Amino acid sequence: MTDTERANPEGRDAYLVVDDDVAFAKVMKRLLSVHGEPTVTHCVEDALAAKPPDGRWTAAFLDFDLPDGNAFSVHEGLLARGERVPTVIITGHIREDVANRAFELGMKLLVKPIGPKHIRIFLETIRGEVAVRQVVEDWRVRYGLTAAETAVLRAGLEGVDRGTLAESRGISETTLRTHVRHMLQKLGDASVSDAIQRALREVISSKGGE
C-alpha cells in the first residue's frame, strides 16, 4: 500500500520513500515533511506505481533490500521511464558490491541510523542537480525538444562530452551532430556554448541568484 500525505502539495518538493520497515518509513516521513511532501511505499511495485504530486520526484530515499527486489530495481525502473531522480540508499550495513554499484549509478549511500542533519546535507548536495533538471524540462516543453535533443542539452549542462553521450545513446557522432543542429535551430542559439550559458543563467536564477 502507498501511504501518501498530499494536503498541500503545490510548490513543495516531492520525495519518494521506499522501505519495508514500517517504523523506519514513518521516521523518514517525519524527517522529510520538514522539507517537502513525502510519499511512502514499502516495495518496488508500489514505488514505481506511485505518482509525485507535481509530476516529478525531487529525490528518492530507498532501503536496499525490499520484498520484491532492491533499491537498484527502483532506480532502474525510474530510469527506464526517463525519470532521473537523485537517490540515496539507506541501509543498516555496507556491502562492498552494493557500494560500488551505487557509485557507478550515481547514487548516494547512508548507513542507519540517520537524522535530520543527514537529510539536510543530502538535499543541499542535490539542489543544483534538481535546478538543472527543472530547467531542462522547462526547455523541453517551451521549445518542443525531442528526447534526443533534450539529452544533448542535459549532457551539456552536466559537462558530459559528445563522445560519451554518443556512446551512451548508441548513436554515431554524425547522428549526434544532427541532433545538436536541430536543437540549436529550435533554441535560436548560435552554438551549444551559447545555449548552455543561457540555460545556466536560468539555473542560477531558479536557485535564488546564488
Where are these regions (language model features)?
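Short, cationic motifs built from Arg/Lys/His that form the positively charged side of catalytic pockets
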Residues: A25, L79, L145-E149, K186, ...
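Basic, Lys/Arg-enriched C-terminal extension of HTH/homeodomain DNA-binding domains
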Residues: R181-E210
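Helix-turn-helix DNA-binding segment
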Residues: V135-T175, R201-E202, K207-G209
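Residues within the DNA-recognition helix of helix-turn-helix
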Residues: F122, H179-H182
